[in-house]
A protein has these predicted regions:
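Positively charged n-region of N-terminal signal peptides that target proteins for export
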Residues: 2, 38-39
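Intrinsically disordered, low-complexity segments enriched in serine/proline and basic residues
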Residues: 2-4, 21, 26-28
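Ser/Thr/Pro/Gly-rich low-complexity, intrinsically disordered segments
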Residues: 7-10, 14-16, 21-22
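Aromatic (phenylalanine/tyrosine) cluster motif
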Residues: 12, 40-42
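Cysteine-centered motifs
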Residues: 33-36
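Bacterial N-terminal signal peptides
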Residues: 42-51
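N-terminal signal peptide c-region/cleavage motif recognized by signal peptidases
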Residues: 53-55
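Short hydrophobic alpha-helices and adjacent helix-cap/hinge residues
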Residues: 57-354
Length: 354
């Protein structure tokens, strides 16, 4: 609706809008002003509404969450779906704005290197996507999951953005020691083979064994060709063998021989993945797709709630247990309930932290 200009006002007055004395008729000016005010108010309302709509649209756009997959493997899509569903549910329960976030799932092969700055959070799944994010997405908040600690993708040399967080598949070594403790009080002597330069694993294992009052026997190797000799020496002195996620020691070439050697000595082996248990290990603490999704979900919620994220490198927050009943029977070991093992581990973990 166009606003009345001064010429139109004059025309209105020339058409009998004056009284006999030539003065404007009483109330005409006030009526005209009221019309102007009403129309100006209408325009202001439209302007405010437009600006508000633009602000809401910008906020919604900035609230987008992008999940980048390294490839088309089923596990990536399973984790991405679990992240989406669990995050929306948690954000809704906590009344966070991420409950209305738009989740996008893409593979890195379909992306342009110049990704727009319209995502509040980016999640990468797998090593390739994490490496892509390091190179191209250093202006975003990034959570990289489904990556092993041994990949050494994290660097503190300043080449990485301070808002790139690494959520490792690896379980803390203490959880594997807790599993051994929960399986049987008879497992007092624990054996483990580690790389000679892996001081972090050595320190962590020694501390955990001390807390749980277990005797730890460590064999260190410099060369993968020495695994057999070190393993045989170790198996004579232990009740149970612990595998650590070191690809120099445990890989497609060595796993079968390690399992056979342990089985011949009637020594159960604790793995670090579900695949290891399916191959012949007695049990393992590992990260399921849902565990990984929950860990990512918790970090996303912290961003939206303004909470501080304390560490850029994070070990798995959640865990699952897999127990191989067939291996247990072949070793004359009693079958254990996974729920029972989890409960025992959690209770003992609480005891050691009290």
């Amino acid at each position: 609706m166009p606003l009345p200009d001064s010429n139109k006002s004059a025309v209105y007055r020339s058409r009998g809008d004056t009284n006999r004395s030539g003065a404007p008729a009483p109330g005409r000016e006030s009526v005209h002003c009221a019309v102007c005010i009403k129309e100006y108010s209408y325009l202001i309302l439209i302007l405010v509404s437009t600006m508000l709509a633009m602000a809401v649209a910008a906020h919604e756009k900035k609230s987008n969450i992008l999940i980048l997959l390294s490839g088309n493997d089923d596990v990536y899509l399973d984790v991405a779906t679990a992240i989406t569903n669990s995050t929306i549910k948690l954000c809704r329960n906590r009344q966070l704005s991420c409950q209305d976030a738009n989740f996008e799932i893409s593979q890195i092969s379909t992306l342009d290197n110049k990704l727009g700055n319209n995502h509040r959070v980016i999640v990468t799944l797998g090593l390739n996507a994490a490496a892509y994010a390091r190179q191209h997405l250093n202006k975003h908040i990034v959570f990289s999951a489904l990556i092993p600690k041994v990949s050494k993708i994290y660097s503190d040399d300043g080449s990485d953005t301070p808002e790139h967080y690494y959520l490792y598949l690896d379980q803390p070594q203490h959880r594997s020691m807790l599993l051994i403790n929960a399986l049987s009080d008879g497992f007092r002597n624990v054996g483990v083979v580690i790389s000679s330069n892996d001081e972090t694993a050595e320190k962590t294992l020694i501390q955990s064994a001390s807390e749980l009052e277990l005797n730890l026997n460590i064999e260190k190797i410099d060369d993968a060709n020495h695994i057999g000799t070190s393993l045989n020496r170790l198996l004579y002195n232990v009740d149970i063998l612990l595998a650590v996620p070191d690809t120099k020691i445990h890989n497609k070439t060595t796993v079968s021989n390690i399992l056979i050697s342990a089985y011949r000595k009637r020594i159960p082996l604790i793995g670090f993945s579900s695949a290891y248990v399916k191959a012949g290990a007695l049990a393992a603490v590992y990260s399921s797709p849902e565990d990984v999704a929950f860990h990512v979900r918790d970090n996303i919620a912290k961003i939206y709630s303004g909470e501080r994220i304390n560490s850029r490198e994070q070990y798995a927050e959640y865990f699952s247990i897999l127990f191989n009943s067939e291996v247990a029977r072949s070793l004359d070991f009693p079958t254990k309930s996974v729920n029972e093992l989890e409960e025992t581990m959690i209770n003992r973990l609480i005891d050691y932290h009290d």
